[in-house]
Amino acid sequence: MNEPNSWVEWVDPELDVDEAAVPQPVVAVVGRPNVGKSTLVNRLIGRRQAVVEDVPGVTRDRVPYDAQWNGRQFAVVDTGGWEPDAKDRAAAIAAQAESAITTADVVLFVVDAVVGATDVDEAAVKMLRRSAKPVILVANKADNSSIEMEASALWSLGLGEPYPVSALHGRGSGELLDLILDRLPEAPKIVEDRPRGPRRVALVGRPNVGKSSLLNRFSGEIRAVVDAVAGTTVDPVDSLVEIGGEAWQLVDTAGLRKRVGQASGTEYYASLRTTSAIEAAEVAVVLLDASEVISEQDQRILSMVTDAGRALVIAFNKWDLVDADRRYYLDREIERELRRIPWAIRLNLSARTGRAVDKLAPALRRALASWETRVPTAQLNAWLTALVQATPHPVRGGRAPKILFATQAGAAPPRFVLFTTGPLDAGYQRFVERKLREEFGFEGSPIEISVRARKKLGPGGRGKAHG
């Protein structure tokens, strides 16, 4: 959900992005120097990460951290002290704080409740009003009830009710977190630990590539009917098997020959059940017949898995039938036909002879680990900053969009959101994805990257956006 008059969602149509994914909301903590912003950030995130020292200017850049409250997750961005008409280093710090405001869904404006409103605070209020962002006025250092009562004088700033807290002692922090959740757009729910039980694996592929033979190899019994006639299996067949010392729930599915919309009768319903099996699974093993050319239908099945956002292992079955000549041509086919999914884990095996089937369990574990990976927001942005500095976006029309901030919106599969000053070139976005994979892995898992591009500033003032 986007904040009105602030951000417009822009998604590269060439990339596989779940438009329904809810980006992780962002809370920016701003204020003049030494009002306790970093101490408040540590209180909100529940751990001591932001650097705190009783001198102004300790925090220089905007620094993001992951936070959780009442089953919801969001990002908290710590900023340096904001001052009007700042010079040199102080000006750079203030600019970073203003950039944090542009990426935020809600701004916490922190004021020293003991000192009261200052000229700098009043100047900051004018800047915040121009930004058109929702603002929560936080009266920090309200360490006792007497100071808490005095904080009511901050109504004069015109930002509504001041909320007294003591970041140092925790006073009022729970109420402030409740208020933050009320003001934020819908924050994604925290994904609870996966319920204990076998991981679900869908075995998919076109007819007669050996799915049922592989299932029977693991189950040790004729659990699925095997016949040389293509299309023997119609209903998905669940089988609890042990692979590599671990229990797995394998779902064998009907072989797919046509698109669902083109199939009819029994084949149509088998296609629907296969689609349902993929949706119900966590990881899919797509079996290809290594002795035959990679077909258009093979690629459609691979697309079904990636479109569903499932972890992926590609198993080239019937490897016992592959000779040296076929291996040469198969390597060329893989380079040509599977170039859009170089991240998929590939295995060469034979369900009939048992060759290399012991490699399947480790491959499944690697794919699932990547599928569930979460990158801490601070680590993600440290990497992204270095990447953009080393290889900035190319200039188009005399200007180049800037990436201001990034967050991981979810996992299973990993979904990332880039906050930018404008749409990114498709090629540059693919470059970011490639480098993201090089840095953090994600072998065997799709990842999704979307862009939240800031609207152009209107004539009404600095930081104001138009609809």
From Swiss-Prot:
<feature type="binding site">
    <location>
        <begin position="252"/>
        <end position="256"/>
    </location>
    <ligand>
        <name>GTP 2</name>
    </ligand>
</feature>
<dbReference type="GO" id="GO:0005525">
    <property type="term" value="F:GTP binding"/>
</dbReference>
<dbReference type="InterPro" id="IPR005225">
    <property type="entry name" value="Small_GTP-bd"/>
</dbReference>
<dbReference type="InterPro" id="IPR031166">
    <property type="entry name" value="G_ENGA"/>
</dbReference>
<dbReference type="Pfam" id="PF01926">
    <property type="entry name" value="MMR_HSR1"/>
</dbReference>
<feature type="domain" description="EngA-type G 1">
    <location>
        <begin position="25"/>
        <end position="188"/>
    </location>
</feature>
<dbReference type="InterPro" id="IPR006073">
    <property type="entry name" value="GTP-bd"/>
</dbReference>
<dbReference type="InterPro" id="IPR003593">
    <property type="entry name" value="AAA+_ATPase"/>
</dbReference>
<dbReference type="InterPro" id="IPR032859">
    <property type="entry name" value="KH_dom-like"/>
</dbReference>
<dbReference type="InterPro" id="IPR027417">
    <property type="entry name" value="P-loop_NTPase"/>
</dbReference>
<protein>
    <recommendedName>
        <fullName>GTPase Der</fullName>
    </recommendedName>
</protein>
<keyword id="KW-0342">GTP-binding</keyword>
<feature type="binding site">
    <location>
        <begin position="140"/>
        <end position="143"/>
    </location>
    <ligand>
        <name>GTP 1</name>
    </ligand>
</feature>
<comment type="subunit">
    <text>Associates with the 50S ribosomal subunit.</text>
</comment>
<feature type="domain" description="KH-like">
    <location>
        <begin position="373"/>
        <end position="455"/>
    </location>
</feature>
<feature type="binding site">
    <location>
        <begin position="78"/>
        <end position="82"/>
    </location>
    <ligand>
        <name>GTP 1</name>
    </ligand>
</feature>
<dbReference type="GO" id="GO:0016887">
    <property type="term" value="F:ATP hydrolysis activity"/>
</dbReference>
<feature type="domain" description="EngA-type G 2">
    <location>
        <begin position="199"/>
        <end position="372"/>
    </location>
</feature>
<comment type="function">
    <text>GTPase that plays an essential role in the late steps of ribosome biogenesis.</text>
</comment>
<feature type="binding site">
    <location>
        <begin position="317"/>
        <end position="320"/>
    </location>
    <ligand>
        <name>GTP 2</name>
    </ligand>
</feature>
<feature type="binding site">
    <location>
        <begin position="205"/>
        <end position="212"/>
    </location>
    <ligand>
        <name>GTP 2</name>
    </ligand>
</feature>
<dbReference type="InterPro" id="IPR015946">
    <property type="entry name" value="KH_dom-like_a/b"/>
</dbReference>
<dbReference type="InterPro" id="IPR016484">
    <property type="entry name" value="GTPase_Der"/>
</dbReference>
<keyword id="KW-0677">Repeat</keyword>
<keyword id="KW-0690">Ribosome biogenesis</keyword>
<dbReference type="GO" id="GO:0042254">
    <property type="term" value="P:ribosome biogenesis"/>
</dbReference>
<comment type="similarity">
    <text>Belongs to the TRAFAC class TrmE-Era-EngA-EngB-Septin-like GTPase superfamily. EngA (Der) GTPase family.</text>
</comment>
<dbReference type="Pfam" id="PF14714">
    <property type="entry name" value="KH_dom-like"/>
</dbReference>
<dbReference type="GO" id="GO:0043022">
    <property type="term" value="F:ribosome binding"/>
</dbReference>
<keyword id="KW-0547">Nucleotide-binding</keyword>
<feature type="binding site">
    <location>
        <begin position="31"/>
        <end position="38"/>
    </location>
    <ligand>
        <name>GTP 1</name>
    </ligand>
</feature>
